Each structure stands twice: as structure tokens, then as C-alpha cells.
Amino acid sequence: MTRLKTKLSALLPFIGLLCAQAQRDMKTINDGWFFRKASTENWQPVNVPHTYNLDAYSQRNYYMGKAFYQKSFVLPEVPQGKRCFLKIDAASKAADLTLNGQKIGSHAGGYSAFTFDITPYIQKNNTIEITVDNSRKDITPISADFTFWGGIYRDVWLITTSEQHFNLLNHGSDGIFISTPHVDEKEATIEIRSEITNDATEKATLEVIHQIYDPQGKLQQTLKQRLSVKAGETQTVRKTSAIGQPQLWSPESPRLYEIVTTLRNPKTGMELDRSTHKTGFRWFSFDGEKGFSLNGKPYKLRGVNRHQDQAPVGVALDDEAHRRDIRLIKEMGCNFIRIAHYPQDDALVEACDEMGLLAWEEIPIINIVPDTPGYDDNCETNLTEMIRQHYNHPSIIAWGYMNEILLTAPGPDRPEWPACRERTVKLAQRLEKTLKQEDPYRASVMAFNMTNLYNEIGLDLVDVSGWNLYHGWYVGQLNDFNRWMEDQHARYPKRPTIISEWGAGSDRRLHSRHPKAFDFSIEYQQTYVEHYLPFIEGTEYISGCTYWNFIDFNVAARQESMPRVNNKGLFYNDRTPKDVSYYFKAMWRKDTPVLHIASRDWPVRTGDKNEKHPVKIYTNLDEVELIINGKSIGKQRPANCHTVFNVTLPYGTSTLKAQGYKNGQMVEDVMVLRLDAMPDLAKGDELAINVGSDCAFTSDVSGLTWLPDQPYSKGSWGYIEGKARSTTSEIENTTDGPLYQTWRENLRAYQIDAPSGTYEVELLMADVSRSRPQLANLLGRGDDGQAIADSRFNITICGRRVETDFSPADGGHYRQAFRRRYIIQNKENKIDVLFETLKGKCHLTGIKIRKL
């Protein structure tokens, strides 16, 4: 790498690096870095955390490749009798490091920390150079339904210790491991395993001291142990003790004990190193019939999956953002989280301990096990790093190591299947063995997708089977979910199960009175969760669930209604809650009243003031009253924490208030909703129609609402003949993609009855007759119509031929939106758009009418 000269003039003084006591000193060195991609020579000043993939928010083919980071700093004096370490909390997905021109090490894996001893290379003036590469195919994951963010996106630490210290080179851990092999209400056993390194040139006699403080900060026990460590060696010592009447940890009462571990010289009393950890005493079990239990009592796991990105910073989040997410998840009523699909920041796991969330953490082995040299070794290293780095966290109850690993594997009818099956099972067996050797006290878990092959080929070797089920979204009907779980339990009644993923996408621009799977309406997502959640809650053998996903998260390869986004979240990417999140809160929060008018995602509607408009309410109250503009509409008793009032609304704004009582105290929620009248062409309104769709679409750019399609009736408007079609492929050259992802095919005409006059008629189209190949895990229900090499048709409006021998593919409009406007004379009190098919199939995706 080219060394920076004039640019790297910023120096970092580490005053206080050498403290009077020889104890550990840790400092972040996140500021003052310079960065460039391999494709450019232009260095840019940056701070870490940093990612070089903000392009993933705007383009499918985001940058995959190498990038370089460089930083210079000065030490006031070279630390004699000290050891210096460089720790990077994460760099994705491979990193090569040099210090002062000398290579100090490499790391393969984008989600775990790694530490190097830089003592031999440190001097007064120092330059760190780090090459990061997010494109490596020999490092897991090789494919996934999330963006492979590149960069140094977590903290960088400079650590100094004495020559005798706890081992910092054990897979990114700090060399201290705390377990609680036995816990009950009367007594708990704690075991502390410490690794001590002597980097001096002489043998050292040392003492390890563990001070155990209870949750109130009172010293409970002091454990001491002497040892002798030869020069240049690392020695492991164990100390076990009993804690009487332990204060148990649970999500409701996350009581944490603090353990301060000190290494000292017993002759001089000098403190050489110190490390502080927190632990909690709890015991748990998974059972195939009775589900999950915590501290001896039945306990339903209620949670979400969590990805770690947030626009506009990608995955380069600060600690406060991680803690905020756990707080939001906890406030929603969760007691459980699946940290998916990779190990996440220490701040997040610490927050789980402190705020009370049980956790499943996993490494990112996803979709398929490739036939790639070194891949299995890399997976095992990833697993070992995750377990050792987060071993001490009481919130973690399960380690996972594969997600939907057969999703893109060849089917059993393919010649490649036997070899793929063998690779997959062999790796699973290897990782299961490693997991149990590393941590015999937690459960192993794997997430299966919707096939029984996992049971048939031996991937059910884990303690708990997780099912990623999307019946009623990607496949089948909602009731198929119930049938699937009932069938699995009948076949394998002793096997513990959890619903590790389930979810439906939603786009706040889309609303439907008749929601259906894959329309991406806010209403279908609500319908979906209102079916799944009561079944999960009411089925004893299901240990619990983690909804997919906590947030709308970035997937550069995703298309659908919101390209670059998986929009199944209960919160938007900016962490604003969707209405549907309050359904979970109403179902799960027993400690506080919940009352929410679920119309924040649909605050502006278009319709007739005499028709009924649904107003949904999520609540855990026994009864709720709805008041509109000061007038009571009535009271209803919710079923499964939701109810719908069908009400008439005046045009303009209305104040809606829902109220009820909990323990004699009034609870209320208030919002303002606006009803706009149906467009009146005679008054100059624009009539915009989302052809081929049952959804209304409101543009977030113009604010214009495109009404759902309907068949023509006299005095109104609508289609004449034709079949509704849809696609999940991205439509380019527009921000209003959903308008072009549904269309009516082979329609004879579209007619709008309107007063005579001059009109502007705008037709929306795209070349939707051909499908763009999608990634295997980007499933969908869009039928894309029938693939037609070329479709040609004539279009006539009010007797005037406006397009002759026309094809949407003309002019390179493949999957690209285009709109054409025509000035038309309406002389017969109707605007009729006639289609004459010459070849293939005609179609229309949208139409807008305006009287001039």
C-alpha cells in the first residue's frame, strides 16, 4: 500500500498510556483515519466505525472488493516492560494488517473481533495500515439476503498491559470465561476459567483474585488462587464456588452479579491486570411437548430477529444505537431476540444482559455449503470466536450455526445432491461437536426453511429445531402454517421447536380493503401477524418465536415494492414503529395498558363520506370506546388484542380518540385522520388509478393517491375485460415502483365516464412481459404474466389513434417505467381507451386523467 506522507500528519498522543500501576489500559483509536477504495488513489479522512458500502442503499451492484485504511499516531515513549495489543471489534469480511511496514496478521470473518500483539512492531512514530475485503468467497457467508457491508465498522482499540496479563489472543476474547453449571433457587455454582500469559523472560509467581458482587453492589465472595507461569507460556486455572440463595436473572428481573478479576504480584501487591464481567444466575430447558422453561417455570419466548443496519450509516452504528434497539425491542414486549444472522456488537449483547432479553446468537452459514477449500475451517473458527467472545453473557441461551442451509442446494433429483448433502451434514456434525466442546451449558440451534429434508438427512442433530416459515406470504395460505407445525409435532413429538422466522412485507404507500399475500399493503402484514401470533401463543409445544424482522433492513439485491429493502420490519429503518408493532405490544405486554389506533400508517384516505371506513385498534384492554370529533361511535370488546370499528367520516380532518380502563384508570390514544373526497373531474381533480391492483398507492414524492382498480360500471370508471397480473421485479427509472408492478393484461378498454371537454390522459406502462432472474432466496408470488418475446398493440383514445404498432419494449424500456400524456377531446361524455392487440398481449399499469 502506498504510504501516506503529508496527509497523515495528525498525531495521537497517548498520555497516560504508562500508568503508575501496571494494570491494563484501553483506548479507542477511532478518529483520524484515512481511507480509499482499491479503485481509486484518492484518500479521504474518516472516523471508524465506517463502511464503504453506502452505495448499497441506491444500487444493486454495490462495491465488492478491497479498501484500505491508514492511521498514524505517536506514543510519548516506547512502552518498556509493557505489551501492546491492537483489537478490532469487526472488519468485513477479511482484514490484513501491517504496522510500520511489517505485517502483523490477518483475519477472515466479518462479524467477530480479533486481536494482535503489536509489541514487537511498536515505536514512537507509528502507522497502521489495514486492507479490508468484502468480496472473499472462501469466507462465510458466500450468499445471503442481506448486504455484505465492507469496512472497519466497529471500534478499534489500543490496549496496553503488563508483561503478565490475561490472555488477549484467544480468538478475540479476554481470556476469562464464566459459567454457571448448576443453578436453582437455593444455590448456584459458578466456575471461572482464567488464562494467564507471561510474556516476560523469567518465570513468574502470580495470584488471581475474583471478587463477586451481588446485584446491589455488595461483596459476596473473594476467591484467590496462586500459580506459577513459565516465561513465554499461557496457563489456565479454574476456580469454582457456590453462591447461596442466588438472585435469579430473568427478562423481568435482569439481576446481574459483577465479577472483578485481578492479576497481581503476590510479593509486591502490584496489580498487573484487571478485567470486569457481569453474569446472571438462571437455568432453562427446551422440551418437545412443554416448550421452553426458565428458572423452573413455563416461559414462552417472544421476540424478533435483528439486523444491524440503519440509513444513512449502514452498519457503522455507535454503541448508543445498539442499546436503543434493545430498548425498543424490550418496550414492545419482547423477552427474546435472535441476533441474526451473525455475531453483533458487544454493546448489543451487554444491553440484552442489562435490560433483560434472552438471546440466540449465530454465525452466518447461509443457503448452501460450498465445495470450497478452507470454507469448513473458516466456519469452525467463526463459531469458536463467537462463543468465546460472548461466552460470559447470561442472556445467551442458544448458539446457532446454519440458516436455511438447503435453500439454494441442488434438489435430491440432481446429480450434485449427494455430494452437497454429504458436505452439509459433515460440516454440521463438526460444528455441533465444536459447539458442545466450547459450551456444554447452552443449546445448539439451526434454522430450517420449508422442507422436510432437514429431518431426513440428519440436520436435526441440534438441540432445538428452528423453523423459518412463510406460509401465506411466499407460499400457500395462512392456515398452512398451522398444518405444518401440527404435522411436524405429530412426526417428532419429542423435538423442541421454535419459529425462528415468520413475516410479511409492508409498504406504507400501499393500502387495501381487500389485502392479499404479496401485495405489500400495510393491511396484509397486519392480517398475517394476526393469524400467526395467536396460534404460536396458544400452542404449548412451540417454545416461542422471533418475528422477521425488527426493522426494514437493507438488501442491495432486493427488488419488490421497495428496491434495496426487505420491508418485513415491525419498525421502519429509522426506528419509527409501524402500527403493526403495537399488536405485538398488546399481545405481549401484561405489565402496562396498551391502546393504539392503528391508522398512523394510513392517516390520509380517499373515499366517500357515506361509506364505511375501517379503524383498527390494538389493545390489551377488555373494552375500548371510539370517539370521533367528540361523538362516541360505541364500545367493542377486542378479540386477540384487536378490534375494528367500521365508521363514516366527514371530509377533511377528524380527531379520533380511543379510550378504555385498566385497573380503574382511564387510558386513551388520540390521532388525526383525513378523508379526501373521490376525485371529481368536473372540478379539475386528477383521477389516478393503480391499474391491476386492489391497493391504493400514495406517492411519497407528489402525495397523489392512485386508487385501486375496479371493473367499469355506468357513470363511473374502470377496466373492461383483461386479467390482473403482477411482478416482484424492480421497475427502474421511477420512485413509484408499485404503480408498474401490477397491470391489467389483454384488456379491451379502460373507460372513464366524464363530462365533455379537453382532457389530459396519461398512460403508465413498462415492459413487464419478461422476467429478470432473481436470487433464489428472493422468493415471491408475482406471476410476471406469460413471457412474450414481443407484444405489439394499437391504442385509441376517444376515437383518436395515439399509438400504432406499439410495444412497451420499444426504446429499451425493459423493466423501466415510462409515462405518456395525450391531449384528448372528449365529445361523448366518456373517455374510452381502446386496446387492439396485434401480437402477444397488451397491458396497462396505470392511468391518470385531468380536465384542462
Model-predicted regions and their roles:
Residues 22-89, 140-143, 149-152, 169, ...:
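Extended carbohydrate-recognition surfaces in non-catalytic/accessory domains of CAZymes
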Residues 676-852:
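Compositionally biased, intrinsically disordered or flexible polar/acidic segments
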Residues 36, 64-169, 173-175, 199, ...:
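Accessory beta-strand-rich segments of carbohydrate-active enzymes
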Residues 48-59, 102, 135, 145, ...:
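Extended substrate-binding grooves/exosites of carbohydrate-active enzymes
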Residues 165-199, 585-620, 679-685:
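Surface beta-strand/loop "capping" patches
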Residues 21-60, 74, 127, 131, ...:
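Accessory carbohydrate-binding/adhesion or oligomerization-edge regions at the termini
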Residues 120-125, 193-287, 644-646, 650-653, ...:
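Extended acidic/polar, glycine-enriched regions
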Residues 29-32, 51-58, 118-190, 275-283, ...:
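An acidic-aromatic loop/edge-strand motif
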